């Protein structure tokens, strides 16, 4: 399968500070890669490398031709005094045709929000509008920077269901950054744990049959949510230095 984007041993430094060290990954059509890591681990920098906004000091980046990327940012800052409807917000995107706006909103089950004020949207509604905006250029790759931040569990389940539906319909790759170190989208194909370098990688644990999980999140939540168990052979001290463990640590 041809990669949309591949990174090979990519490193990035800002001044004397090494932010990313020897990071490698592949983003493929129809596949979801979830990136986990603590605050300050370099996740946002890695996203900017994938988007082409940061040039690495070392390593190789390969992109598939004229790759179309749809990006959903971590946060949206709007002037609360500025009257701005969803329709107007989406039309601000360069190259957008007004006849494409409602179909994009309907695709993310948000057609009813077209005339709603942006400032009045809930966290989940805002994420759907941003996702609709990302779909306007018919992306081959969706980059979602913490799409479930500020969204309750039911909203997370609905968003994960929608993301899975979109990747199947569009056959697009998905890079998703998560602020939760353990709870991830169950249908993720690969999970990478980042702390300036790749600490570990794997797949989510199937938990849909666990009675405790079903009772906590319901049948639909158990289907869409998964647990990622880390398997590190090291830890990071307070200065960020790597300290090797005697045996693999799972958490």
From Swiss-Prot:
SMART domains in the record: AAA
Q: Which GO terms describe its biological process?
A: response to zinc ion; zinc ion import across plasma membrane
Q: How is its activity regulated?
A: Inhibited by arsenate.
**Where do the annotations place ATP binding?**
37-44
Its GO CC terms are: ATP-binding cassette (ABC) transporter complex; ATP-binding cassette (ABC) transporter complex, substrate-binding subunit-containing; membrane
Membrane topology value: Peripheral membrane protein
The induction comment states: Transcriptionally repressed by zur (zinc uptake regulator), in response to high extracellular zinc concentrations.
**Keyword Protein biosynthesis attached:** no
Q: What keywords were assigned to this record?
A: ATP-binding, Cell inner membrane, Cell membrane, Ion transport, Membrane, Nucleotide-binding, Translocase, Transport, Zinc, Zinc transport
Task: Tell me where it resides.
Answer: Cell inner membrane
Gene Ontology MF: a single term: ABC-type zinc transporter activity
Q: Record's superkingdom?
A: Bacteria
EC number(s) given by UniProt = 7.2.2.20
| Catalyses which reaction(s) | Zn(2+)(out) + ATP(in) + H2O(in) = Zn(2+)(in) + ADP(in) + phosphate(in) + H(+)(in)
One Pfam short name: ABC_tran
- Annotated ABC transporter domain ranges read 5-220
Query: What binding partners and quaternary form does the record give?
Result: The complex is composed of two ATP-binding proteins (ZnuC), two transmembrane proteins (ZnuB) and a solute-binding protein (ZnuA).
**Family per record:** Belongs to the ABC transporter superfamily. Zinc importer (TC 3.A.1.15.5) family.
NCBIfam families the record matches? PRK09544.1
Its biological purpose is as follows: Part of the ABC transporter complex ZnuABC involved in zinc import. Responsible for energy coupling to the transport system.
- Which protein is depicted? Zinc import ATP-binding protein ZnuC
What is the organism field in this record?
A: Escherichia coli (strain K12)
The lineage is: Bacteria, Pseudomonadati, Pseudomonadota, Gammaproteobacteria, Enterobacterales
